[in-house]
Regions:
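Conserved catalytic core of nucleotide polymerization and phosphodiester-bond processing enzymes
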Residues: 1-151
Length: 151
């Protein structure tokens, strides 16, 4: 989906370019709706010089490199989800106690939350109306990073 070319794919898989071309051809054949989405997004980036996240945020695309448009939409939408989740979690914790200590890339770190709050925060972070569900991993520790356990 990130528009990797056969040369880069072959290198990453330590394979031959013809094998990578075959893999890509089979992938696009198996998932024509993804191929259509990729082609349309690249075309829009090239034609308009911009694309939009699923939330409508505009992202500029260099018309000389329109293939980046797909990744921009995917990563931009993920960033939007993170910002929305951060706002929702902050609002919830302000009303119910606890703090957001920090964010690291696509993670939120919390302090002073009750274990009973974890399921609600988990729900807040996954609550998006996409045709495909969003999954969020939740780890918890009372002491340190070394003691993290999946919830």
């Amino acid at each position: 989906i990130y528009c990797i070319g056969p040369g880069t794919l072959a290198k990453n898989l330590e394979s031959s370019v013809p094998a990578a071309k075959g893999f890509l051809a089979n992938f696009w054949k198996a998932y024509p709706e993804i191929k259509r989405y990729v082609d349309n997004t690249i075309s829009k980036g090239e034609k308009d010089g911009e694309v939009k996240t699923l939330f409508g945020r505009r992202l500029r695309v260099d018309r000389e490199r329109p293939y980046v448009a797909v990744n921009y939409v995917v990563q931009g939408t993920a960033g939007d989800c993170m910002k929305i989740s951060l706002y929702r979690a902050h609002k919830y914790l302000k009303e119910n106690g606890g703090k957001i200590r920090n964010t690291v890339h696509d993670q939120m770190l919390f302090d002073d939350i009750d274990e009973k709050q974890i399921p609600e925060i988990h729900k807040i972070m996954e609550n998006f109306s996409f045709s495909m569900p969003m999954s969020v991993d939740v780890l918890h520790s009372e002491k340190s990073w070394g003691d993290l356990v999946e919830v």
